[in-house]
Amino acid sequence: MPGRGRCPDCGSAELVEDSHYSQNQLVCSDCGCVVTEGVLTTTFSDEGNLREVTYSRSTGENEQVSRSQQRGLRRVRDLCRVLQLPPTFEDTAVAYYQQAHQLAGIRTARLQKKEVLAGCCVLITCRQRNWPLTMGTICTLLYADLDVFSGTYMQIVKLLGLDVPSLCLVDLVKTYCSSFKLFEASPSVPAKYVEDKEKMLSRTLQLVELADETWLVTGRHPLPVITAATFLAWQSLRPSDRLTCSLARFCKLANVDLPYPASSRLQELLAVLLRMAEQLAWLQVLKLDKRSVVKHIGDLLQHRHMLVRKAFRDGTAEMDAGEKELQGQGQGQGLGDEDVGSSSLELPAGKRPSSPALLLPPCMLKPPKRVCPAPPVSMVTGDEDISDSEIEQYLRTPQEVRDFQKAQAARQAAQGTPNPP
């Protein structure tokens, strides 16, 4: 057979293919010499008798790893090494990426979503192992848009059916506060702005817990709340030197980015602290404002559980309390004037005690303004004819029914038509 070479022993050209198990062999039919066996060769002259074997036939793989998947796997491994994650994290993130890349919704997605897929798999792995890592950190490393990243993250969790716990706020506070450059003196940080790390972290945790108890954290990004709490904790430890420092300058000194909603979270925290300060007798005479209340944050946090209960009332229990108050009004009418007078000794005449504020999320206390659609213009003038089927809705008494029947009979008689049976 031409084109297959000759037998090296007898020189015959009668070479045939013989399958030995799953291995193809080229055998001389005259002398039985095995010319080629498998894909391994020992000399350069043997290469002329070999044929090219495809990757899928030699390894049993039906599909090759695409270039985009190879780039994604490299990106996953690079992220894990940059973040200094344990090797087990890297293996889990790679496995999640390979599973997600096989999904039809991901393979046909646009390039922007595929680029953030590696970061989503790393974030899922860290969340499952309670490793403090935020979405913003991954987006900064990948130069990715936060909205695209969050949408892809939720899609991957849903498609893969993963159980991802929520981020531990305490661990996030410790990790985030450790990145502040305020714990050692430097040319960019004056000595009066340097603070002890443990004191600042302890007070920041208390302020974040207070924000969590008063609905300032629910449904929001945690970093703006933590930034505002860290700023207040830093100011309250040495208020005489730091009250003049603004939030923007504080973030610049600490070498951290200022989140956009941090100013709003700061004002909400100060409003909560003012409400709590109104419940302390020695602070009521000082007429505190949002700037001077920072000096007394230590006292407020020391009694925060009692002050929160006194300063706020639960919105869900408000209706129950109102019903009990209405029921007690009838019983209280028999009380004498002495009891009524004793309850209002400290209040001026004609004034009622102020009720505590509602303990509700800010989105319910100040709902966003929505455009109300204009009511449809009614073209009804009142002169329209009423059909016989609709007029029955306007009849109320039997007398009206009889009068209507008489009027209808008279109308038919006037028109010369016989009455219906």
UniProtKB/Swiss-Prot annotation:
Residues 108-114 are annotated as: Interaction with target DNA. Pfam families: BRF2-like_C_cyclin_rpt, Zn_Ribbon_TF. In response to oxidative stress, Cys-363 is reversibly oxidized to cysteine sulfenic acid. Oxidation of Cys-363 impairs formation of a ternary complex with TBP and DNA and down-regulates expression of target genes in response to oxidative stress. Its main location: nucleus. Residues 367-421 are annotated as: Required for interaction with TBP and formation of a ternary complex with DNA and TBP. PANTHER family: TRANSCRIPTION FACTOR IIIB 50 KDA SUBUNIT, TRANSCRIPTION INITIATION FACTOR IIB-RELATED. Belongs to the TFIIB family. This is Transcription factor IIIB 50 kDa subunit. It comes from Bos taurus (Bovine). The lineage of its organism: Eukaryota, Metazoa, Chordata, Craniata, Vertebrata. The gene is BRF2.
